[in-house]
Design a protein with these regions (language model features):
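Basic, polar low-complexity surface loops/patches
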Residues: 1-90
Length: 90
């Protein structure tokens, strides 16, 4: 598991009942079961990275997607990025 995914997993443990919007650059990414559910609910493209389901929304449009999920009864947790993303994804 990459350092980035370790960080995601640790944060997701704290917010297991929420959809975790995980900021990476100009996007909020969702992974694993969150990605599968959100892609279905919002009709987003579900992709995979190293067998990990993922989907994302642009930061500048995130309020629209978050509002839609809240209207559907979902709880949201937002994790902002601090610092730069390393080339190795960590």
């Amino acid at each position: 598991m990459t350092p980035l995914m370790e960080q995601y997993a640790n944060i997701k443990k704290q917010y297991a009942d929420e959809v975790l919007f995980f900021r990476l650059g100009d996007f909020y990414e969702m992974f694993n079961e969150d990605a599968v559910e959100v892609s279905r609910l919002l009709n987003l493209t579900l992709t995979h990275r190293a067998d990990c389901p993922m989907c994302g929304v642009p930061y500048h449009a995130s309020k629209i997607y978050i509002a839609r999920l809240l209207r559907l009864g979902k709880k949201i947790a937002i994790c902002e990025q601090v610092g730069e993303i390393s080339p190795g994804g960590g």
